[in-house]
């Protein structure tokens, strides 16, 4: 039985949640990503892995629709976590949730700034700036998740946190 036949791990569930591709097509993407793990790991950085995936899965190249930036980010994070590829303390603002959270937290006031990566074209903020913004804010938040989370955990938390705030309004 192929290692791609059964997908029960949380990475698969996250990728499915963010993808607009059909389950069948997404399974092809997932299996191809798993097969190419060694190639991606050799690239050595989140940025290079992400760009490689975006090129591979752009609709025109792969013929599979619905594999956008968020799905590529999730696939890239799967590899980065599995092989301990550093994000260099960058919290990537993938999608509107983390971007809105960063605006609500006023992360860009003062010394912190939103940076755009020259390699990926995506925006990010530094983890320390996100932690400091939460600590300075008057909003309720999960102190443990923010203080002890890695870059991807904090990005996910920002998305969920912002979503909960919108529901309360």
Task: Please identify what each model-predicted range represents.
Residues 6-65:
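Helix-hairpin-helix/helix-loop-helix acidic hairpins
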Residues 36-50, 54, 73-169:
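C-terminal accessory module of base-excision DNA glycosylases/AP lyases that mediates lesion recognition
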């Amino acid at each position: 039985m192929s290692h791609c036949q059964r997908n029960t791990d949380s990475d698969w569930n996250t990728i499915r949640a963010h993808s607009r591709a059909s389950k069948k097509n997404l399974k092809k993407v997932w299996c191809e990503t798993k097969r190419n793990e060694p190639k991606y790991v050799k690239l050595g950085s989140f940025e290079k892995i992400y760009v490689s995936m975006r090129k591979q899965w752009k609709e025109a190249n792969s013929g599979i629709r619905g594999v956008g930036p968020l799905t590529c980010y999730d696939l890239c994070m799967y590899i980065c976590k599995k092989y301990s590829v550093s994000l260099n303390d960058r919290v990537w603002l993938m999608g509107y949730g983390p971007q809105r959270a960063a605006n609500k937290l006023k992360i860009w006031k003062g010394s912190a700034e939103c940076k755009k990566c020259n390699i990926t074209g995506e925006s990010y903020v530094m983890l320390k700036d996100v932690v400091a913004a939460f600590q300075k804010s008057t909003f309720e938040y999960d102190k443990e998740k923010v203080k002890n989370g890695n870059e991807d955990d904090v990005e996910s938390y920002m998305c969920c946190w912002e979503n909960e705030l919108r529901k309360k309004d």
